[in-house]
Amino acid sequence: MFKLSDVKFKDVIYIKELHIPPKTTTCIIGESGSGKSTLIKLLNHLISCDQGEVTFQGKPIVNIDPIKLRRQVIMVPQVPVTFEGTIQDNLLIGLAFAEKPQVDQEKLKEVLRIVHLSKPLDTNADQLSGGEKQRLSLARALLLDPEVFIFDEPTSALDEQTEDKVIEGVIREIKNNHKTLIMVTHSQKIANTYGEFIAVMKAGNIIEVKGAG
């Protein structure tokens, strides 16, 4: 699905080759500053490489309209984005931006259950904790139902027990819908449990890909 060949970005990363297959869960792990967040920004074309090539579904990413790409490849950042208004407003605004049909309240409640966010839909989003806002961002991404989900430490504000439940539920939903997940995680446990492929980064390089057979 994604392929990187001789990709360099400033002095941050240099990746000789990396292939991320479709309909799988790929976890990206490594020490702080190893280039993980830069890598996923390249995949979503938030930044462009200085040399080499990134392709998505066989096409150079630079030749794909950025808006169309980001509707197919949804990123959930570590610091959650929330908008003024209620939980319901925050869920529906993603569909509006993506020009997708609105859904009923039962569907909204369903995605909240998946991310274990037990709050009424009319709750003001400003009243949510950091961990609750992270779960709201995950729920909004699930509603959009893209081809690819990219998560950057999406549960860093959660305790380990809650994190396990949320990640398990979200990944189950993504796999049931035969979608692709690329996730930066600080948790070796999560990577080992859910990663069909694990890409290990160090000093801007992919030093190992586990699970590739």
Question: Which ranges hold each PLM region?
Answer:
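Catalytic Walker B motif of ABC-type/P-loop ATPase nucleotide-binding domains
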Residues: 149-153
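Helix N-cap at the start of a conserved alpha-helix in ABC-type nucleotide-binding domains
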Residues: 160-162
